[in-house]
Amino acid sequence: MSLPDKAFPVSWDQFHRDARALAWRLAGLNQTFKAIVCITRGGLVPAAIISRELNIRLIETVCVASYHDYVNQGDMVLLKGIAPELMENGGETVLVVDDLTDTGKTAAQVRTMLPRAHFACVYAKPKGVPTVDTFITEVSQDTWIYFPWDMGFTYQEPIAKGAG
């Protein structure tokens, strides 16, 4: 599999630093979160880091699938919903965590379930920015982020070779 022109590979170390930066930003909100709802699968890793840093013990998942072929975003499929007790009061004490907001479709679907929750992600693309409350790094819409859990060691052509 060759990398697209605008590839953004993220190492484990970089992702850990960025997820901790997100935790710092969230801590600065002076808001008490009683639970994290992570959007799986991408939200699992940042949720683990953020839950440790903010001492949030209750972690729930919501399973929404949209990338069925790892390339193109397709129809949203809700595979697992959220525990009813976390949906009380619109989820006002809930922190929703994901790795990335791309088009914002996934966050928008989850926001219908938790309209008063705080939505946070590590990375954001312009179309997804309006659907989250807090993020760390914005990348262009046509950039493909390669997360460390999706990658092995691969060779990348130098940028200058593709500019020709």
Curated annotation (Swiss-Prot):
Any single GO BP term = GMP salvage
Q: Pathway, per UniProt?
A: Purine metabolism; GMP biosynthesis via salvage pathway; GMP from guanine: step 1/1; Purine metabolism; XMP biosynthesis via salvage pathway; XMP from xanthine: step 1/1
The parts of the chain that form a coiled coil are none
Keywords associated with the record: Cell inner membrane, Cell membrane, Glycosyltransferase, Magnesium, Membrane, Metal-binding, Purine salvage, Transferase
Q: Which GO terms describe its cellular component?
A: plasma membrane
Which Pfam families is this protein grouped with?
Pribosyltran
Q: What residues does Mg(2+) bind to?
A: D99
Major enzyme class: transferase
Which residues are noted in the entry as guanine-binding?
D102, I145
- List where in the cell it is found: Cell inner membrane
Name the cofactor(s). Answer: Mg(2+)
- Does the record bear Signal in its keywords? no
Q: Which residues bind 5-phospho-alpha-D-ribose 1-diphosphate?
A: R41, G42, D98, D99, L100, T101, D102, T103, G104, K105, T106
The record's section on InterPro entries has:
PRibTrfase_dom, PRTase-like, Xanthine_Guanine_PRibTrfase
HAMAP family the record matches: XGPRT (MF_01903)
Q: What is this protein called?
A: Xanthine-guanine phosphoribosyltransferase
